[in-house]
Amino acid sequence: MDDLLASIGLTHGTRSSRKGTWTEGARKPVGKKKKLAAETTKVPTPKIDFDFSSLLAKAPAVVHGFSTRSGGVTRVYRPGLPKSQGDLNLGFTSHDERKNVEANRTRMMQALLGKEAKDWKLVTLQQRHTPVVRVLRDTEATHLRGDAVMTDLPHRLLGVMTADCIPVLLYDRKNGAVAAFHAGWRGTLARIVERGVGTMKIEYGTDPKDIVAAIGAGIGPCCYSVGEEVRHEFESQFAYAPELFSDVYESEPIRDKYPLLFMTARAPGHSPIGPQLHLDLWEANRRQLLDAGISAKKISVVGTCTACGTSRYFSHRTEEGFTGRMMSVIGVR
């Protein structure tokens, strides 16, 4: 038997194969060792989504983006998310830990800038719904008070935070200046965007015809109900104010599905419960940009309502104040 086994290259207690020789009972190869795959799998970093302006995206010298709520480490607002997911809260709110916000800001800049992130500084504002416009001249400044900021310094990412208010970004193609605005109804009423364009004229010699503008996601006319006092305020400032307001009746799903059950009900407009007054802040800020001399062809509007889309955006109104903040950013290389 031994002679027979030897004739085919085998002996008692061993087996031959193409990958080496194993001794009977052994688990590891005696010949060339084979690396074993790691038993653990690296969890990928959640994707960070941005909204972008198609117009600003055509300018290679500009970096911009409107953040959404996905891809961060914050879990306080949606604790039911899978452990591998979190919100990208970019504002220092009273609910979230500072370390989470700092980690989220780092992620945001890396996602937007890649390897360039280390060369950039993030400049933010202490926002108070004012018409205050700040000009960044100091290369070391990173936090200012106001609701708009502009600069022509390179590698400065200007950021405004929102959770329903309207973010507006501007780029002067000729002079290489950029600006970011936080426009709630008070800032819009105070013409903060128009003021900003005027400041750019003084600071950089900007011609409005050279400006490209982008209006980001915010609460839309579908959801932004306001009081009559707000309408009166706008009518005192803008001749076109009536075009910014609309009467909206609340949807009644049961009535819509079973109209025959409500045949004896009063027609819309004749019910004791009247319509709600809604304001279109997107259009209000677009009109200000037009009045400032910017061409309609150079104004882009994301047109997505934050109050309707809380799976993608933070909304102060829909989430009753318990929410994070998005950040809209712009800078020049």
Where are these predicted regions, by residue range?
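Active-site microenvironment for binding and transforming phosphate-containing groups
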Residues: 1-333
